Amino acid sequence: MLLTVALVGCQSEETQSNTGLTAQAKADAVVAQKRQLAESFSQNYAAYAHTLKTQISADNLSISVSELVESAPNTEMSQQLRSADKNVRTLKGIDQFTEQLLQLRLADASMLKEWQEGQSPLFAFEPSGNDDSWQYIEAYDVYGQIHQLDVYQLPDVPVFVVDNDSAVELKAGLQAMRAEMQRLGQSPQLSTQESSSIEASTRSLSRSASADTAPISTTVLKKIRLQDDKEPWISGRAEIYALVTGVDPSRDKPTIDLIDMPYLDYDKQDYFPNQVVIHWTRYRWGAADMILMEQDDGTDYKELAKQLVKVAEEVLKLIPDPEVQGYAIIAQITGKIIEAIPDGVLVNDDDFVDVFYTLMQDTQYTDHPGANGNATATFEPLTIYPTK
């Protein structure tokens, strides 16, 4: 499962790739690729059964397509796997940032014993569109027959899911978004934004700091908890990231930073990441908002980056003198991002998790609820001395 925002709008030139496909059409093409692979795996299960049983375990419920190709590199099925993986990466705009993406994943650890004891599995894929509209999950048995599974009730038979490796996808997706945002004029994101801990942030800053580098003001995410993660069983673990939004201190341009949260997998569980999430030299008025997102399987990351920048810049263009309104502008930017990104960019519109409005520099927030009440977090100010 992966976090993102629900967005409304019409299809336009901005939601089309260089190939002319709309984002919805690209998402449908991704699903079609996975459907074909699920059917092919069902028909070729005997050829891969040994490899799967030696690689799949309680500690590792998935195997990458590249590993399956290595087990039989010269077969027609391996050629299909290579081609599908390349196509999906291209459709999602991340081909330049990862060499492999697809995997075969056992849907739940509870299925492992029965499968290892000889129960034939089904092979499924995630449908297209918003999961609220899904009527069933399609899965193929080893005879090529289609079964219709309940969307939310975990099946009582082993099911392998043809899926994206969500961690690989999110990492590559954020890289693609950062590159596209920088191309569109956003100032480069500082290294602390990409670090998972205070220690890593400090080491990264120290490597490039001179002896007279000034202390750096940041805000650290000390604790976070999600209340409800209503995802179908086929979607697997959540992959959460955040958008930190604000205004550039030196020009009338928005600042949008992307924060990876690879640890935040499940709801109703406390996490203590000690992660630097805001670097205050990038934000005017010492104020910023933070939107929590769930990665969407249908996301085209380059198009999403374009839309984020476009929407934020349009808000600022409507305000002649930002200093008059001050940091109240930030909530307008955040609100437009949540409301205005077209449904064609994020085809599964259940992805907005929560938002923290008006986080202030040098301010501590303890068990601070998000505006939707779905997330609770503790933030603390931290001054980093890079040369120490």
Residue ranges of predicted features:
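Long, charge-dense tracts
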Residues: G20-P215
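A eukaryote-biased signal for long
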Residues: E314-K388
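Calcium-regulated, polybasic anionic-phospholipid
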Residues: R225-Y263
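Polybasic, proline/glycine-rich intrinsically disordered low-complexity segments
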Residues: M261-I291, Y327, A331-T334, I338-I341
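Short amphipathic, basic-aromatic surface patches that mediate peripheral association
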Residues: R207, A211-I234
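C-terminal motif of bacterial Sec signal peptides marking the signal peptidase cleavage site
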Residues: V5-G9
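Bacterial signal peptide processing site
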Residues: Q11-E14
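Eukaryotic beta-sheet cores, primarily in C2 and C2-like/PH beta-sandwich modules
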Residues: A242, F272-E314
